[in-house]
From Swiss-Prot:
PANTHER family assigned to the protein according to its UniProt record, in alphabetical order: UPF0260 PROTEIN YCGN
Stated name of the protein: UPF0260 protein Mlg_1382
InterPro entries: Puta_zinc/iron-chelating_dom, UCP006173
UniProt cross-references to Pfam families, sorted A to Z: CxxCxxCC
Length: 155
């Protein structure tokens, strides 16, 4: 099969993809939209079950994607270099998988042809997170810290 016949992600380097191709790589899992922190003791990056206020927790897509940085100035802009170096990206992330020389997973919407496949495969955060604007968010974050550092809890 020639490059023109193969899917773009199988032959184009991340840097050579068009904006539309780059955006199509997003599987819609919502994991990169979770509030995370780095554990000072271990260096591990821990994702909380609390999502950015702009994430639609049902569709797992940003509700204001084109202008998201106006509302969330520190929203991370993923780049090919970031895909190679940011180890906090989930191992399932298409950008990370391609940067590491792995192909897309069978459940990825570009492979399956079905945008719901990421949810059916249990990869997305659908049904497992709350918005940062939800009153339960602070408690969720506190519970993560409590599990990591049981002796340092404020009761």
């Amino acid at each position: 099969m020639t490059g023109a016949e193969r899917p773009f992600w199988e032959h184009l380097p991340l840097e050579e993809m068009s904006q539309a191709q780059w955006e199509a790589l997003c599987d819609g899992c919502g994991r990169c939209c979770l509030h995370s922190f780095e554990d000072e003791d271990t260096g591990a990056v821990i994702a909380t079950p609390v999502a950015c206020k702009l994430l639609d927790t049902q569709s797992c897509r940003c509700t204001r994607y084109p202008d998201r940085r106006q509302f969330v100035p520190d929203c991370t802009q993923l780049t090919p270099e970031g895909a190679r170096s940011w180890k906090w990206l989930p191992e399932t992330c298409a950008y990370r998988r391609l940067a590491e020389g792995r192909g897309l997973a069978d459940w990825h919407p570009l492979v399956s042809g079905d945008p719901e496949s990421v949810h059916r495969a249990g990869i997305s955060v659908r049904g497992r997170v709350v918005s940062e604007q939800d009153p339960r968010a602070a408690r969720q974050i506190h519970q993560v810290f409590a599990r990591l550092h049981p002796g340092n809890n404020d009761k």
